[in-house]
Amino acid sequence: MASSSVEFRCFVGGLAWATDSNSLEKAFSVYGEIVEAKIVSDRETGRSRGFGFVTFLEEEAMRSAIEAMNGHILDGRNITVNEAQQRGGGGGGGYNRGGGYGGRRDGGGFSRGGGGGYGGGGGGGYGGGRDRGYGGGGGYGGGRDSRGSGGGGSEGGWRN
């Protein structure tokens, strides 16, 4: 089975900083065969952003995992598990990649917003510049996290 356009992927949020892809896969593998388990990390620091994705081979396995693991304690943290939204096809986002500045502007290290993130071009993805890096700004696959007029790609630039 080459690359299928159908994915059975869960979003897993609220993860402990210590949770890695291997422990995520181990926790979810009891529900079915896993294609991929991935913790999303910050591009600049390499630190976990506190969320990840688990992709199952079969839909039934994904549904079982969502039902059983949502609200479950993993590595000392109460996690949230939902069906992941499909990535945007890249259209509509252009060069803006996630709405510009995002949330925080205090030098907290996450001032780049979602940086495109999951959710694709133009959307806030999972970013939003929050301390944990998810659930803020545009939210889960949400709208734009821009300042006023809708960003603008080349205007203002990124805060580094």
From Swiss-Prot:
Gene Ontology terms: biological process: defense response; extracellular transport; miRNA transport; regulation of defense response to virus; RNA transport
- The RRM domain extends over 8-86
Locate the compositionally biased regions of type Gly residues. Answer: 87-160
Q: What is this protein called?
A: Small RNA binding protein 1
Can you tell me which family this protein belongs to?
Belongs to the GR-RBP family.
Query: How would you summarize the oligomeric state and partners of this protein?
Result: Binds to small phloem-mobile single-stranded RNAs (ss-sRNA, e.g. small interfering RNA (siRNA) and microRNA (miRNA)) in the phloeme exudate, including viral-derived sRNA (vsiRNA).
What the entry lists under InterPro entries is as follows: Nucleotide-bd_a/b_plait_sf, RBD_domain_sf, RRM2_NsCP33-like, RRM_dom, SLIRP/GR-RBP-like
**GO molecular-function annotation terms?**
miRNA binding; mRNA binding; single-stranded RNA binding; siRNA binding
Major localization class = secreted
Give the source species. Answer: Cucumis sativus (Cucumber)
